């Protein structure tokens, strides 16, 4: 978001970057490398080619880097680990590497994390022990191949595993109807999700009157969710009822889309 409006496109030194993922561009670019930021409403490619304003605009952020003609190599890495005495310690790690010059922008970044807690000591079921994991990779390549051809694309991968468990007990004070009454509940929830995504853009200026643009995108995702609950009630030491519920849900999806356009500028004729 910028000035209350969603940013649709990011350019760095005038070159398109991080297609359909502007947040990634801002996350990987250090502030000390930025010379100037310009926000504007960019016309559609068809409008810029034809010179006719079709009214279609997208909020665009252009980032000008310091010394744009120089090759710049920069990155960062972070690592943190927990000290708790658990079987699998918690950790968090991230790394990024960038190579920038006037005609080419290359970025790679990755992250991994795990948060682990002690197992519930009195649980009937054993699972991942309240362990949550997240992993991700992201890469971008943008290049002005020559005066006619410009390409840009990125790949992203995300994987998340989330597990949780809880135990609860309710004990009621004695009454004339019973000496003791106890309700026990145990619940577990596990999910495993993964996704891959690719965005690509090709812009080829055949000549002054013809131009081709191709923008495909692909997404593949899968997910598994499982939940388990166990409930029981006892009165005066005798079991009144016991229930166990288990649910499993799996989903897989594949999506492909994009657009192809061939723009041609016809010769203008004066209307008499």
What does each model-identified segment do?
Residues 1-228, 245-272:
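Membrane-proximal, glycine/serine-rich, low-complexity loop/turn segments characteristic
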């Amino acid at each position: 978001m910028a000035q209350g409006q969603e940013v649709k496109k990011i350019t760095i030194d005038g070159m398109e970057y991080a297609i359909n993922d502007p947040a990634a561009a801002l996350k990987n670019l250090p502030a000390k490398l930025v010379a100037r930021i310009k926000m504007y409403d960019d016309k559609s490619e068809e409008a810029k080619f034809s010179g006719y304003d079709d009214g279609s605009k997208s909020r665009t952020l252009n980032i000008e880097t310091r010394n744009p003609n120089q090759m710049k190599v920069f990155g960062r890495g972070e690592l943190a680990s927990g000290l708790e005495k658990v079987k699998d310690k918690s950790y968090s790690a991230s790394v990024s590497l960038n190579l920038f010059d006037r005609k080419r922008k290359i970025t790679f970044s990755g992250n991994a994390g795990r948060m682990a807690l002690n197992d519930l000591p009195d649980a009937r079921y054993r699972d991942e022990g309240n362990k949550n994991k997240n992993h991700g990779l992201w890469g971008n390549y943008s290049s002005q191949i020559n005066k006619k051809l410009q390409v840009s694309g990125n790949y992203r991968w995300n994987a998340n595993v989330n597990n949780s468990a809880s135990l609860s007990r309710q004990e009621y004070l004695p009454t004339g109807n019973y000496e003791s009454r106890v309700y026990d509940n145990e619940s577990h929830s596990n999910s495993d999700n993964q996704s891959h995504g690719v965005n690509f853009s090709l812009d080829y200026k055949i000549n002054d009157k013809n131009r081709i643009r191709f923008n495909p995108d692909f997404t593949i995702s899968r997910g598994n969710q499982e939940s388990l609950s166990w409930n029981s009630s006892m009165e005066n030491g005798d079991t009144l009822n016991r229930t166990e519920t288990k649910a499993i849900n799996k989903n897989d999806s594949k999506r492909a889309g994009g657009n192809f356009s061939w723009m041609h500028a016809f010769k203008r004729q004066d209307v008499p």
